[in-house]
Amino acid sequence: MELFATDRDRLAFLLETDAALDLDFEALEARAGELVTEELPPDKRPKYITNYIGSKQKLVDWIWKHTPEDVESVVDAFSGSGVVAYMYKTKGLQVLANDRLRYCYHAARAIIENRNVRLTDDDLEMLLADNPKAGTFVRDNFKGIFFAKGVHGLIDTIRANIDKLEGYKKDIALFALGKTCMSGKGGFGHFSSSTRYGKREDTPEEFRKRFRKNVARINALVFDNGKECKACRKDVNEFLPEVKADLAYFDPPYATEFSTTNYEKAYHFVEGLMTYWKGLTLVEDSKTKHYET
């Protein structure tokens, strides 16, 4: 069973997706093999760029412009990629970011809640090292879709190695792996198509290189704004009664007569990857192998 019933549904979905933005990262690229391990000054810190569906990347300046001057704390109830929450953190506000999806939660823990923890070069080499004890779930269940030959096994290996980490280091690694799986040459940035058009063409070596870059970028985004920011993973109806803030920002999934964006199905691969599909059951007759929700 395909995610979209008609071509019109698929087109509506794609029209909601922001195009990926290029990031000028020459300063960090020049330091090949050396991760940023301490806080960068604001003018040296890279922008947080995302191509997550519905991202307000292009609107963060407008959102800040319309934020009242006396606001000191903000709740982002559907944080998604975390781009708005991160913007508010850079402005010195206390941020409470919430999202039901695990990938979004790990992203928020990595760059919103996290104040000073970063991956080291040794951590990165460990994550990319061979692991004969790694599982084969991705290789066994997603063969031929989403990624080029050899990448499925590499994802299994990196994911197994991530379990050797704890705390914010693990969040950074999961965030980086998810971002790497979403991006690359080809593909739509999500996992709604099993056709060749939905397959990323990167070789295993190119995947490793992008994973390294994503770790470097995330490391560089980590900073302490002097406020206790928090990431949560709760149903919004449970989350809101528990928190207090000067401002509440709401950007929920959109449902219209033309489209109902199901983020969990669109990003089912990275969502499953966050727990290595523990407790999840794949829909075997689905071409995209999404799990039951």
Predicted regions, residues:
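A general structural motif
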Residues: 70-72, 92, 170, 244-245
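SAM-dependent nucleic-acid methyltransferase catalytic core
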Residues: 6, 38-40, 45, 56, ...
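Glycine-rich, phosphate-binding/catalytic loops in enzymes
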Residues: 91, 113-114, 260-270
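SAM cofactor-binding core of SAM-dependent methyltransferases
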Residues: 75, 79-132, 140-143, 163, ...
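S-adenosyl-L-methionine
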Residues: 2-75, 83-84, 90
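Conserved proline-anchored active-site loop of SAM-dependent methyltransferases
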Residues: 63, 74-88, 97-102, 241-262
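A conserved mid-domain beta-alpha-beta active-site/ligand-binding segment of alpha/beta enzyme cores
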Residues: 291-293
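PRPP-dependent phosphoribosyltransferase catalytic core
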Residues: 132-149, 155
